[in-house]
Amino acid sequence: MTLSLDPDGDGYDDDEDYSLLPTRVDADRRAVKLLLGGRIDRVDMYRAEDGETVYVRVVDYKSSKHDFSVKSVKDDMNIQLLLYLFTLCSPENRALFAEESGGLPTRVLPASAVYMSPDESDRMGALLPCRTGIVLEDPEIINAANPDDTQTYLPSVRRGKDGGFTGKGLCNAAFMAELETILHTAIRDTAAAMYSGCADRTPSDDACKYCRIKASCGVSIT
């Protein structure tokens, strides 16, 4: 973890234990505990100027271009990145962001979720990162994520002629909260359907591309 939202900083210490406590999601109205595991590629953190709030960004590195889409989250797909982000920000995991003195932050809030992948080289042959995702529309957060003013690591955001930032990657705190609700609803609905015996296949180019049993499934993707 870094003490800023600058991905050029040092990563977390491999000798430390950063295991997350799971966020419980109840399926239907039964006492069914859903445990979803995974490994986060990168976590960046920023201690706000108020001294009480920690903001978190998660970064998922991809070998090829990968677009962030709110629609895919609403369609119960592509939820992994947001699941990491909101699990990190849950009260159960606040101890991960304790100060050296042991003091815990009053709040741990989501700042950004980013897919990063290599893109075409520029004219000088340097590899340019391709990034998509969301970032909180807050000057303090944007400045922390963009300390050298290059916009290299801001997802789908650009600086306008007036000096302000624009782009589809910007979102406010209310939309972040809405995304968390959408995410938990998607997980809950999918789990409830599975426990009720419904396990219909949902073919798509993305869902079936790496499936190990697609040859025997009978699904035809055009």
Q: What are these language model-derived features?
A:
Residues M1-T222:
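RecB-family 4Fe-4S metal-dependent nuclease core
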